[in-house]
């Protein structure tokens, strides 16, 4: 498996692949890889001649320095996990200065309001940081396709908007959420949960499934109130937000409209660890 730390060496290798008429698939990650990431890699391998996995803990998307410091990092373990899939993958793991240059700054984007709701409401500047690093990665790697998980659905829509705004020739592929047997969405943060916390956190997906059923016959307001009450009665999890939104615009739904696609989004804390999830709603 080839591991690139310098972007110039990677660019040269990519030019060789592209000159042979082969396609590049990118799976951008912040490391701490798990089965969810591997499912993205599997999708990329089916759809691309050469797959590149970027492993980079991006400082510009953290609004909380403590969160950045605590984010799990183990490059050797990540590489071992990828090698079990295939040794044909390339890994790009630069330092912040290698990727950004001397000034590690976040760029401001106009995401037309997609960035100001839900996650954006609670994490100031987060999506500008995401947009900045993804734009840098796309410019260095020039992928034909990039693969993102639907667990971060808001991020997925923002990346699609980034492509629309910048005109970068990258096809964005959304991949289904991978879940643990309990239903808990796979996440790097799950590593920080105790065995008991992990069991208790399965409640999040259970509530989402019930909200989906309820939304089939009830209003968005009624469904939201029901979810909030479920968390008021739960001693182990603290709800940060639950929102039903239009799948495309991410605008909060007040009244259901026929033919529209909706999604429920949730963020909750388990013993101080923030977990997010979402589900497509039947209308």
Curated annotation (Swiss-Prot):
Catalyzes the condensation of pantoate with beta-alanine in an ATP-dependent reaction via a pantoyl-adenylate intermediate. Beta-alanine binds at residue 61. This is Pantothenate synthetase. The keyword Nucleotide-binding applies. GO terms for molecular function: ATP binding; pantoate-beta-alanine ligase activity. It comes from the Bacteria. Its main location: cytoplasm. InterPro entries: Cyt_trans-like, Pantoate_ligase, Pantoate_ligase_C, Rossmann-like_a/b/a_fold. It is an enzyme of class 6 (ligase). Its EC number is 6.3.2.1. GO terms for cellular component: cytosol. Homodimer. Transmembrane segments: none annotated. The active site is at 37 (proton donor). ATP binds at residues 30-37, 149-152, 178, 186-189. Keywords: ATP-binding, Cytoplasm, Ligase, Nucleotide-binding, Pantothenate biosynthesis. Pfam families: Pantoate_ligase (PF02569). It catalyses: (R)-pantoate + beta-alanine + ATP = (R)-pantothenate + AMP + diphosphate + H(+).
